[in-house]
Amino acid sequence: MTAPATTTSVAPVAADDRPTVLSVRNLDISVRSDAGIQPLVQNLSFDLKRGETLAIAGESGSGKSLTSLAIMGLLPPPAVHVAGGEILFDGQDLTRLPEHKMQHLRGDRIAMIFQEPMTALNPVMRIGDQLTEAIRAHEPMSARAARARALEALQAVRLTEPERRLKQYPHELSGGMRQRVVIAIAIALRPDVMIADEPTTALDVTVQRDVLDLLRELATEMGMALILITHDMGVVAEMADRVLVMQSGRQVEEASVLDLFGAPQQPYTQHLLASVPRMGQGRERGVDTKARPLVSVRDLRVTYDLRGGILDRVQARVHAVEKINFDIYAGETFAVVGESGCGKSTVARALTGLVPHEGVIQFEGKPLLRDRASQLANTRAMQMVFQDPMAALNGRMTVGDLVREPLVIHGIGTAQSRTDRATELFERVGLGPEVLDRYPHEFSGGQRQRICIARALALSPKLIIADESVSALDVSVQATVLDLLEELKAEFGMSYLFISHDMAVVENIADRVAVMYLGQIVEIGSSAQVFGNPQHAYTRRLIAAAPYPDPRRVIPARARSNSELKSPVMPVGQSPEIVSYRSLGDGHLVAV
């Protein structure tokens, strides 16, 4: 079931005569540490008008989330504190209000939506109880009246079957539905100001689109002022009236969204906008698909049994990947895209032997075997770069040891030659030999990902599997890492299996693309074919949902999906229907 489609003009210009509801004046935030008091945010000032959407944009460590926590009075005491300035709301300086008065304002007059909905909800309370608890904490009313208000809030956020949702627990809802519940709690008391701190970062792109549409509509309907904290300039372009750009705790630039994107004044803003990958900027790339594939996958199938009951019997089965076929050719970047649960990361794990699978995987014409000797040989030919570099690096080892470790495991070279190789690789990824004796925690996120890439290159692999390898990085760092991957491919002649949910990144880096949905490939072809002439409805939906960093763009009319995503879990004995394909020529296949 879908709601009526609407055509929305993006980022309307704010009226100057609207009253100001919140003023921040010369705000300073500091932290106490062993080294003394360190400034985190310095001399920040801005006004927020009624009904306006102000985006506070910047990269990690810019101070944007600290600013939102300061407004809410939620800075972690005693280390982090407001060191100076004012936060004026309704004639009161929030920095000087006692906690009991701030508790009354929080949720009632100023509400906040956090990035991760699961951590914002109590996992052992039903949704209805959490809503009514928040409502009755601020407005004395009967349980029946509070329940009616809770139901009204769930209806306002367009949640299907709101009566049933009241009785459910958070874990029974999808990520997008949980975020809608968090928004429902925030609007239940009809606040004057809503702060949304990266409200869609943890969500899939189509769910993100629905949540952004919802926030825009609710702000208009309820006359709320909205502060949107984000690092995504595409989201800024589509949502904001005005933009405040922060870097390292300082205000860099503030302007209307049209002025900021049309004529950014500061070098940092210009660099930030130039780093954003844009749809429609991919280039035609030639791949010799008549040559023998480097990797050939046929009828790949991965399932997981779900056990339960007193006898711990298999009760259902997750069909993570179901009978997919694809080839990867020498020197190409083959991208697999899709949303959470589509099976794309499972494909990577199957190729590297990390999960049991059915079907045939061939590397250079030979089947990949699962015995230890074969798997050791496979790791020389195939390496992975994971999403979270900090989790992928042993914090107790120096980065030099981490890069030398694959050479030690495979018995390659002498101690000196391994050090020489590590030095060479560090220089190639933009880090000098002086870093060899440092530890992972001493580096930034982008530098740690470069270390992971250096380690992956140590064995001179023919295929690197990059599983969401840039999704956790700031946009400017992401751009430099993507450029590095392109340079390394050209220099060493490697192939990439690039796994991502970011359609703009994929269009800019991939030679060919496979779109996955519920464990199956629904469209496959060259980047130009898939992005320039998408045929499957799901592919078109993914492309349409991607935020675009241009506030002049008008969001096309689109029906909002209120249905829940289908599940890959099926009863034992049942399997999903295997798709068949229609060929559009030149290797462009679409599921029918």
Q: Predicted regions: what is each one?
A:
Residues 14-20, 160-164, 257-317, 375, ...:
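Short catalytic/signature loops enriched in Gly
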Residues 82-93, 359-370:
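Conserved ABC transporter NBD signature motif
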Residues 168-173, 177, 439-443, 447:
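Conserved ABC ATPase signature
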